[in-house]
């Protein structure tokens, strides 16, 4: 097999180059933002003073003394304007206790809480990407496995380097046959036959695999790290890593909990399931303490882990491509021959949620609402257009990942010859993506019906359920203020006298097509194909549960849903397909990174170089708010 130039001339630790670039750019930008805006800005005027109170109260208190900690916490007056619990402040206090020299009373140090979380986020994302890729590889091998298919029966088939390495690793775990006294001619002893699928499956419990080999297998590739860093470079997410907002802490904890759920459902995990379950419970409680709506994402993580695990008990004859058929297969699995394994999987994934659910019930009973503080400005509403705004946000920032995902589903994706130029390969892949989208919308009566339902649903949503929040209409520091002014206006069509067009209705087809495209990508690239449609439905239900009750439109609210959409819609193809599309996946990733870089340069440039003034009567002088304002998400 031909060896790539990178294999002939390897770069030492090349998988860490994307991380080093990400860290360098992030730290330099953080320093620039702090020098430009050294005082608390916008929501920081609420968060920073509150965090400073907790830091002062616990500065000389040992965290191991629960009684002293509780006494000091109850002495702190909580700001009535804050609508989120004090989880982020607990993280800052914890860092001040653990890290030497850390001062959590200063603005720069408090902002560094999010900076630390942002710098470590690519490692966490890469871990999740690796877990999903491993699950997809095992699921693909299990789907293709047949006892009659062995390596000796497929000598004419090209075997990739990765498959050879898997076979070698598996063969080292097999004991060689021991010759008897009457059969001491080793030439007549046939070696054990191992199929590719068997090599892909986890090693049996108790196998003594060397530690170094296990660590090497867990090491992320250069592409995985580049992908993780690019995902964390998402402009709204990356920007709020430089301010003291709750978004980074919320995102980090939800992803950590998701990674732990993946560990809980891995047969070859290195940590006992009981310990993993306890870690999930603690992480979930802290995630809800940072932002209340994270309870939805905790439920999503538990449900998707359960779905992936119990999907293995669904037989091939019960699987289908629509959620109804898959749901019927799941119900049959719950009461079929494998019902014990089915309910065991449900119990394993539901148990870690019990503590956080108990905490949430106590909180609701004490507070009377999911919102803390100023409840009047955050009333629950039926804001159905939020789903349209989200898919538009996802399409804007995820256009190239979506195209890459769609083109991999098309049968035309691999038609180009190996000698094609880079531009020709990319152009062909875009055509394949468009072809896949067309197939998803008009290829069958069911697809046409789904498109019609999406169009009708979004039209009713934007026509009858559009909400204009007072904060969005009055605060000219946010980009949504300027976008909404264009969105809510009517524009006359010069060629048609007297006719106007409303942008909110004109974008309805875009909303519908984006929803169908992302749903198709989620379903097709689900780890377990037998439950892919159910997984897609589960994701959209969780997203709606978070966004629809929210009357305010903010890109920050879309971050968690988009990160999960980006991670789970990525093509985790078998290794041979990855080798054929290696060039293409780097092209799409480079385009995504370039888009993010351009947006980040513009937004940071506006924040630093384009300040503007508010009148003194419009600022909160009691909170030391300054009249100099800056643009941000």
Swiss-Prot record:
Read off the lineage from the record. Eukaryota, Fungi, Dikarya, Basidiomycota, Ustilaginomycotina
Q: Which residues are glycosylated?
A: 265, 367
Job of this protein: Dol-P-Glc:Glc(2)Man(9)GlcNAc(2)-PP-Dol alpha-1,2-glucosyltransferase that operates in the biosynthetic pathway of dolichol-linked oligosaccharides, the glycan precursors employed in protein asparagine (N)-glycosylation. The assembly of dolichol-linked oligosaccharides begins on the cytosolic side of the endoplasmic reticulum membrane and finishes in its lumen. The sequential addition of sugars to dolichol pyrophosphate produces dolichol-linked oligosaccharides containing fourteen sugars, including two GlcNAcs, nine mannoses and three glucoses.
Instruction: Show the GO MF annotations.
Output: dolichyl pyrophosphate Glc2Man9GlcNAc2 alpha-1,2-glucosyltransferase activity
Q: What class of enzyme is it?
A: transferase
Report what the protein is called: Dol-P-Glc:Glc(2)Man(9)GlcNAc(2)-PP-Dol alpha-1,2-glucosyltransferase
Q: Does the keyword Transport apply?
A: no
Functional pathway = Protein modification; protein glycosylation
Disulphide bonds annotated for this chain are none
Principal subcellular localization? endoplasmic reticulum
Q: Which family does it belong to?
A: Belongs to the ALG10 glucosyltransferase family.
Indicate the transmembrane segments per the record. Answer: 9-29, 112-132, 192-212, 225-245, 270-290, 344-364, 384-404, 442-462, 498-518, 533-553, 587-607
Q: Does the keyword Glycoprotein apply?
A: yes
Q: Which GO terms describe its cellular component?
A: endoplasmic reticulum; endoplasmic reticulum membrane
The scientific name of the source species is Mycosarcoma maydis (Corn smut fungus)
The membrane topology noted for this protein in its Swiss-Prot or TrEMBL record is: Multi-pass membrane protein
Q: Which reaction is this enzyme known to catalyze?
A: an alpha-D-Glc-(1->3)-alpha-D-Glc-(1->3)-alpha-D-Man-(1->2)-alpha-D-Man-(1->2)-alpha-D-Man-(1->3)-[alpha-D-Man-(1->2)-alpha-D-Man-(1->3)-[alpha-D-Man-(1->2)-alpha-D-Man-(1->6)]-alpha-D-Man-(1->6)]-beta-D-Man-(1->4)-beta-D-GlcNAc-(1->4)-alpha-D-GlcNAc-diphospho-di-trans,poly-cis-dolichol + a di-trans,poly-cis-dolichyl beta-D-glucosyl phosphate = a alpha-D-Glc-(1->2)-alpha-D-Glc-(1->3)-alpha-D-Glc-(1->3)-alpha-D-Man-(1->2)-alpha-D-Man-(1->2)-alpha-D-Man-(1->3)-[alpha-D-Man-(1->2)-alpha-D-Man-(1->3)-[alpha-D-Man-(1->2)-alpha-D-Man-(1->6)]-alpha-D-Man-(1->6)]-beta-D-Man-(1->4)-beta-D-GlcNAc-(1->4)-alpha-D-GlcNAc-diphospho-di-trans,poly-cis-dolichol + a di-trans,poly-cis-dolichyl phosphate + H(+)
PANTHER family, sorted: ALPHA-1,2-GLUCOSYLTRANSFERASE ALG10 (PTHR12989), DOL-P-GLC:GLC(2)MAN(9)GLCNAC(2)-PP-DOL ALPHA-1,2-GLUCOSYLTRANSFERASE-RELATED (PTHR12989:SF10)
Where is this gene product found? Endoplasmic reticulum membrane
According to the UniProt entry, what is the EC number of this protein? 2.4.1.256
Q: Which GO terms describe its biological process?
A: dolichol-linked oligosaccharide biosynthetic process; protein N-linked glycosylation
Q: Give the UniProt keywords, A-Z.
A: Endoplasmic reticulum, Glycoprotein, Glycosyltransferase, Membrane, Transferase, Transmembrane, Transmembrane helix
User: What Pfam family is a match for this entry?
Assistant: DIE2_ALG10
Instruction: Report the domain of life of the source organism.
Output: Eukaryota
Q: Which InterPro entries match?
A: Alg10
């Amino acid at each position: 097999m031909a060896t790539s130039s990178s294999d002939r001339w390897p770069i030492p630790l090349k998988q860490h180059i994307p991380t080093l670039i990400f860290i360098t750019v992030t730290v330099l930008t953080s320093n620039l933002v702090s020098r430009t805006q050294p005082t608390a800005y916008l929501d920081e005027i609420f968060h920073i003073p509150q965090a400073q109170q907790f830091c002062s109260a616990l500065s000389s208190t040992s965290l191991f003394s629960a009684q002293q900690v509780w006494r000091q916490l109850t002495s702190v007056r909580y700001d009535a304007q804050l609508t989120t619990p004090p989880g982020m402040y607990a993280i800052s206090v914890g860092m001040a206790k653990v890290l030497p020299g850390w001062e959590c009373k200063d603005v720069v140090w408090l902002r560094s809480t999010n900076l630390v979380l942002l710098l470590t986020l690519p490692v966490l994302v890469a871990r999740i990407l690796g877990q999903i890729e491993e699950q997809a590889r095992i699921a693909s091998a299990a789907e293709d496995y047949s006892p009659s298919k062995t390596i000796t029966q497929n000598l004419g088939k090209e075997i990739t380097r990765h498959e050879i390495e898997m076979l070698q690793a598996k063969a080292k775990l097999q004991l060689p046959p021991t010759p008897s006294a009457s059969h001491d001619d080793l030439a007549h002893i046939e070696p054990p036959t191992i199929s590719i699928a068997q090599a892909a499956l986890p090693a049996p419990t108790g196998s003594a695999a060397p530690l170094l080999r296990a660590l090497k297998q867990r090491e992320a590739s250069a592409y995985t790290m580049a992908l993780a860093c690019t995902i964390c470079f998402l402009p709204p997410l990356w920007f709020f890593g430089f301010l003291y907002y709750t978004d980074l802490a919320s995102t980090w904890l939800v992803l950590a909990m998701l990674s732990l759920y993946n560990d809980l459902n891995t047969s070859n995990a290195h940590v006992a399931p009981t310990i993993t379950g306890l870690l999930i419970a603690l992480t979930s409680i802290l995630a809800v303490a940072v932002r209340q709506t994270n309870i939805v994402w905790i439920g999503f993580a538990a449900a998707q882990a359960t779905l992936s695990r119990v999907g293995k008990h669904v037989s091939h004859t019960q699987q289908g491509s629509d959620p109804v058929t898959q749901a019927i297969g799941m119900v049959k699995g719950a009461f079929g021959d494998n019902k014990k394994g089915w309910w065991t999987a449900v119990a394993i994934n539901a148990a870690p949620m019990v503590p956080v659910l108990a905490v949430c019930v106590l909180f609701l009973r004490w507070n009377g609402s999911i919102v803390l503080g100023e409840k009047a400005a955050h009333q629950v509403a039926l804001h159905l257009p939020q789903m349209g705004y989200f898919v538009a946000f996802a399409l804007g920032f995820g256009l190239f990942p979506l195209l890459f995902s769609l083109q991999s589903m098309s049968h035309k994706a691999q038609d180009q010859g190996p000698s094609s130029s880079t531009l020709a390969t990319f152009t062909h892949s875009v055509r394949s993506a468009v072809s896949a989208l067309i197939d998803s919308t008009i290829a069958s009566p069911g697809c046409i019906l789904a498109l019609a339902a999406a169009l009708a649903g979004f039209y009713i949503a934007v026509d009858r359920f559009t909400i204009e929040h007072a904060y969005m209409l009055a605060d000219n520091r946010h980009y949504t203020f300027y976008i909404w002014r264009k969105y809510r206006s009517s524009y006359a069509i010069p060629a048609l006298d007297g006719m106007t067009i409303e942008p909110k209705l004109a974008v309805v087809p875009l909303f519908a097509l984006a929803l169908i495209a992302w749903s198709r990508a989620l379903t097709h690239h689900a780890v377990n194909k037998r439950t892919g449609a159910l997984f897609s439905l589960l994701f959209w239900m969780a997203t709606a549960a978070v966004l629809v009750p929210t009357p305010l439109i903010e890109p920050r609210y879309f971050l968690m849903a988009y990160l999960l959409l980006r991670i789970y819609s990525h093509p985790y193809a078998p290794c041979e397909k990855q080798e054929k599309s290696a060039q293409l996946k780097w092209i799409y990733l480079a385009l995504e990174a370039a888009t993010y870089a351009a947006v980040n340069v513009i937004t940071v440039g506006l924040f630093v170089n384009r300040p503007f003034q508010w009148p003194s009567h419009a600022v909160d002088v009691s909170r030391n708010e300054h009249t100099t304002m800056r643009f941000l998400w």
